[in-house]
């Protein structure tokens, strides 16, 4: 393995783990890093499989709760309501994402200006919503009404545009619909599980001929980096947003988006 390739794998893995579960768009950051830093050697297989590190991070943090939900599912009405609610929220983006997959990957993902613009727009919206005097009505993710699960799922469809952010769209949607800040982030975590697993499986199937055994050492580096970083983020994000809200992430998006647009004007 070349040292440059190892550094690329490590940096992209860290970037994936750091940004996947916060409302700043992990896809946007990785695509911009690839554009400006020339991270091309890792390839599509790498970009797909490092997501598995982030997926396993959230599964490990919520393992006991997920296992208990699985045990309670046959006989507990509230658990069934929550699991069905997650599936309802998952379906809109899954359907649209599958139908528009090729357009999203070949057109939208190839536009760094679009990514930067969406980072800026999303940052402004996140800052505005975080400053609104919203009165939370829903604090328990397992007791959301069915229509609320669907409404949050419709907001998640916005994240199919790179630079928007899956967690950002679901969190903003949840906040506007009356969900408390901590519960908004927590439900975004749960919704991430079927969404990321589905996207991972679909992308892996579409690119099944790309992966070779020679890629495995590089993928392992990115995978571990993504797992460890995402593990840290998932463990501490809920407490952070409960105390501080989402303004930090709004400013983060603005800075990255503006710097990205300026860089595109200078270097293309």
From Swiss-Prot:
**GO cellular component labels:** plasma membrane
Q: Describe the family membership recorded for this protein in Swiss-Prot or TrEMBL.
A: Belongs to the UppP family.
Which keywords label this protein? Antibiotic resistance, Cell inner membrane, Cell membrane, Cell shape, Cell wall biogenesis/degradation, Hydrolase, Membrane, Peptidoglycan synthesis, Transmembrane, Transmembrane helix
Catalytic reactions on record = di-trans,octa-cis-undecaprenyl diphosphate + H2O = di-trans,octa-cis-undecaprenyl phosphate + phosphate + H(+)
Protein name per the record: Undecaprenyl-diphosphatase 1
InterPro entries given for it?
A: UppP (IPR003824)
State the gene name recorded for this protein.
uppP1
Top class in the EC scheme: hydrolase
The way it spans or sits in the membrane comes to:
Multi-pass membrane protein
**What's one GO MF term for it?**
undecaprenyl-diphosphatase activity
Q: What more does the entry say?
A: Bacitracin is thought to be involved in the inhibition of peptidoglycan synthesis by sequestering undecaprenyl diphosphate, thereby reducing the pool of lipid carrier available.
One family name in Pfam for this protein: BacA
